[in-house]
């Protein structure tokens, strides 16, 4: 009877039910601003570097520079997220990124920007983001009751992914009616607004650091936990493949705009990728809004498998579009499937991770996902400069490979149980 009541209650979760908690609402707003700033920079940096160098490789390198630092930084970031007061650490990262974005805007506006300074600043952005992301993920579960955690994660993912609409959408009028250089100021303004929101959070949040383990032992605690838990290990490897094969598309958007959509004018170089990013973000918003209403664990397990397969198939559709409206619709399908898949994955990992080491577990998660996306953005940049490479071949090959991996994952016992029944009750009861 109690289980039936719990199931009915979970199915009645409202889409925005977690926003009734003030500190979560502040974190949600700050996440919206920081992510919008990040996606605006992704569009602007890629277009500017291609304008300066006419090289897809450089676009891939700059995109990688913003993501690959997570391979080195995130283990230390997880340690910091469990050692320090999480809200204070998060505020510190927002302040640093605000300063870096202001510096980049000044360089661009004064015509001093070249590919090397842009790459170095992108790397510093990535280092700080590698601390910001696991700290955000470790703080979030302390701001809502456990029964609202999956809803809160879905809403947080809604903003993280849906900011791809807000950030590039704000860029378009500045690019069209002023100039692309002025648009760089937007990222700094958005980070400033987010920083104020973080400073208003009042809930204290700490992890647990074991003194006897030493710094190294505490650093690897999150990775050790993931790879000694069969379900976590399988889930992490699947998510790594997903990020590498279906989500490393940022460096490809200038290439898609030029070769597939025929957008070759000077401002089109900035506007084309912005429109594609808006399509992705719109799909991500719809996907996460739909997912936020799904409280039943069994349905979530079924959706996880279906969304994984769709994450591989939708990029194939995007690869064959030749007009901007259809490309935006296909990008929306990619955004809906990939972001909803990542929301479910992150929610499962956050639920399974003990509170005392959640920061280190989430940093290990970021380490895997950002490292995969950063590395494969660089690989895609190299591939796009190969004379015979086309968008259908690039997106079709990687997308089909992940769809096959996803279907093959049903052979793994722990994942098959997750697809069939969702998370086990003992995980939800902790």
Regions found by a protein language model. Name each.
Residues 2-12, 148, 199-224, 419-428:
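Flexible cytoplasmic inter-helical loops of multi-pass small-molecule transporters
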Residues 9-68, 224-280:
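Helix-loop boundary and gating motifs at the non-cytosolic
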Residues 30, 155-163, 238, 364-369:
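Hydrophobic alpha-helical segments of secondary membrane carriers
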Residues 32, 114-131, 326-340:
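Hydrophobic core of transmembrane alpha-helices in multi-pass small-molecule transporters
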Residues 41, 50, 103-107, 125, ...:
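MFS-fold secondary transporters
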Residues 45, 131-144, 340-353:
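Intracellular juxtamembrane helix-capping segments at the cytosolic ends
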Residues 60-62, 72-76, 83, 87-96, ...:
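C-terminal transmembrane bundle of multi-pass solute transporters/carriers
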């Amino acid at each position: 009877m109690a289980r039936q009541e719990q199931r009915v209650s979970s199915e009645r979760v409202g889409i925005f039910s977690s926003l009734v908690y003030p500190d979560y609402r502040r974190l949600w707003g700050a996440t919206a601003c920081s992510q919008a700033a990040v996606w605006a920079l992704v569009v602007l940096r890629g277009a500017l570097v291609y304008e300066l160098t006419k090289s897809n490789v450089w676009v891939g390198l700059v995109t990688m520079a913003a993501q690959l630092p997570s391979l080195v930084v995130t283990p230390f970031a997880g340690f910091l997220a469990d050692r320090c007061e999480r809200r204070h650490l998060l505020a510190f990262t927002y302040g640093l990124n605000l300063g870096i974005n202001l510096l980049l805007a000044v360089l661009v506006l004064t015509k001093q920007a070249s590919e090397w300074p842009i790459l170095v600043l992108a790397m510093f952005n990535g280092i700080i983001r590698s601390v910001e992301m696991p700290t955000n993920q470790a703080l979030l579960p302390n701001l809502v009751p456990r029964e609202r955690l999956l809803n809160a994660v879905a809403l947080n993912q809604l903003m993280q992914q849906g900011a791809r609409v807000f950030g590039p959408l704000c860029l378009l009028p500045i690019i069209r009616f002023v100039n692309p250089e002025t648009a760089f100021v937007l990222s700094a303004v958005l980070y400033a607004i987010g920083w104020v929101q973080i400073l208003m959070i009042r809930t204290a949040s700490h992890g647990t650091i074991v003194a006897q383990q030493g710094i190294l032992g505490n650093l690897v605690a999150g990775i050790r936990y993931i790879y000694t838990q069969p379900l976590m290990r399988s889930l992490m490897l699947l998510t790594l493949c997903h990020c590498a094969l279906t989500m490393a598309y940022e460096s490809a958007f200038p290439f898609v705009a030029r070769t597939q959509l025929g957008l070759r004018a000077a401002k089109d170089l900035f506007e084309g990728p912005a429109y594609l990013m808006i399509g992705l973000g719109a799909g991500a918003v719809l996907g996460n809004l739909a997912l936020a209403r799904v409280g039943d664990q069994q349905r979530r397990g079924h959706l996880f498998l279906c969304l994984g397969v769709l994450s591989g198939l939708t990029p194939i559709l995007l690869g064959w579009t030749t007009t901007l409206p259809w490309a935006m619709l296909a990008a929306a399908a990619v955004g809906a499937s990939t972001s909803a898949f990542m929301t479910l994955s992150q929610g499962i990992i956050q639920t399974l991770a003990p509170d005392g080491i959640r920061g280190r577990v989430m940093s290990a998660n970021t380490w895997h996902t950002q490292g995969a996306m950063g590395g494969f953005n660089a690989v895609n940049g190299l591939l796009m400069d190969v004379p015979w490479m086309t968008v259908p071949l690039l997106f079709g090959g990687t997308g089909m490979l992940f769809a096959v991996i996803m279907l093959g994952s049903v052979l793994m016992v722990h994942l098959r149980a997750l697809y069939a029944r969702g998370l086990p009750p003992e995980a939800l009861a902790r």
